[in-house]
């Protein structure tokens, strides 16, 4: 099935990007990362998995809120480092995230199924695929784990927690998380290779 036909079958995200997000689309990333082209996912087929995750929530409401709005803090609270020191990484994660989201323009689960209410959060002002929280979480986790190898498991656990929470909230599909994780790890490794290695030498 062609991309055009899939897009017709799965109506895209309906919303307006903020000026900040539009600005990121024009920005040039510091690191060159060759993001592969992914198959366009099927919204309807993934709705049951989203509903199941929402029903069997693993996180308490307070934890869910923290993963939604304070995800970065969860990583830097684990290590002796400051978020500001990773501004280039975070900016690139944001740039690549919005590029991919606009490229696929996938509708959010609540836009596809009337069984899912629109969540009360400001973190759904972009298309669904891939998950920006997953991209950022795994990108940061990979970079920090390189510098703090003794914290690797804890950092990766937080990345999984943040990513899973997005599906449990009903704002993402499982494939959003899966691909977001893959992209985040790619960017994190590029940062290690191109930035952290230079700093170490």
Task: Tell what function each PLM region has.
Residues 1:
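Extracellular cell-wall/glycan-interacting regions and their flexible linkers
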Residues 169-179:
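A structural-propensity feature for long, helix-poor, extended segments
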Residues 4-169, 186, 190, 195:
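Hydrophobic alpha-helical bundle signature of multipass membrane enzymes
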């Amino acid at each position: 099935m062609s991309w055009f036909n899939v897009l017709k079958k799965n109506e895209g995200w309906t919303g307006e990007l903020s000026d900040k997000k539009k600005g990121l689309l024009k920005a040039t990333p510091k690191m060159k990362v060759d993001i592969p082209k992914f198959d366009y996912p099927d919204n309807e087929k993934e709705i049951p998995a989203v509903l199941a995750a929402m029903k069997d929530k693993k996180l308490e409401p307070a934890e869910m809120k923290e993963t939604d709005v304070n995800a970065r803090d969860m990583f830097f609270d684990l290590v002796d480092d400051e978020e500001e020191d990773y501004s280039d990484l975070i900016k690139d994660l944001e740039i690549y995230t919005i590029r991919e989201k606009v490229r696929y323009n996938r509708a959010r689960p609540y836009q596809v199924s009337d069984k899912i209410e629109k969540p009360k959060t400001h973190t759904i002002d972009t298309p669904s695929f891939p998950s920006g929280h997953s991209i950022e979480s795994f990108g940061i986790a990979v970079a920090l784990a390189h510098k703090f190898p003794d914290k690797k498991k804890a950092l990766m656990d937080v990345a999984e927690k943040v990513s899973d929470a997005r599906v449990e909230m009903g704002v993402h599909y499982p494939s959003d998380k899966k691909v977001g994780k893959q992209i985040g790890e790619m960017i994190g490794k590029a940062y290690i290779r191109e930035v952290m290695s230079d700093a170490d030498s």
